[in-house]
């Protein structure tokens, strides 16, 4: 029996192509891309999203993750004086490049996007447009869930909004905006009225609290969208 089982195993491996074998061996069922907020150094990786990233990885055994490499700058000298708009444009391009490349390597892996503040904005751009190219085709289809927290693109009335904000962020989407090409059903965007960046509040500390306040809700949403 053992010999027969081993023979069947070797036969199945021989029948599989090299790409299929590589995917079986190295591609997880779930992979997370996360983007940090403005002024947080690249060495800090995920920034404020870290606890949520770790929660998602705990929920899906074997899940992988990586931080988007981009300036996360707002004009300050510590990040090279790169303007906020330039940083967001670079970040958006980095998201599209990283997700597309990963999908080409691991086409069956389900992808989750998580972004905080400017990091949320670049994920927003990659899915919904606004700063260069967006995700398209198979790479877009691989994204099963996206979480934006404190996204300055926030505008009241968008179908994926969560939280108490009834106004808009400092880089708000225009009136009548429609997210495209992504399906809005895969997105949740968290913003509260106290936040001066994604809304019109005056409590900058609240801007850092979304994982604490909504982390469990965001995790539940992700779990409802990912089938692994």
Regions found by a protein language model. Name each.
Residues 113-123:
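Gly/Ala-rich beta-loop-alpha elbow adjacent to hydrolase catalytic centers
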Residues 1-24, 228:
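Fungal secretory targeting signals
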Residues 25-27, 105-106, 137-142, 179-184:
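Extracellular/periplasmic catalytic domains that process cell-envelope and extracellular macromolecules
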Residues 158-228:
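C-terminal catalytic-base region of ester-bond hydrolases, centering on the histidine
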Residues 37, 143-154, 194:
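Active-site nucleophile loop of the alpha/beta-hydrolase fold
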Residues 129-139:
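Conserved hydrolase catalytic core segment
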Residues 43-46, 125-126, 157-161:
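Short, solvent-exposed loop/turn and secondary-structure capping segments
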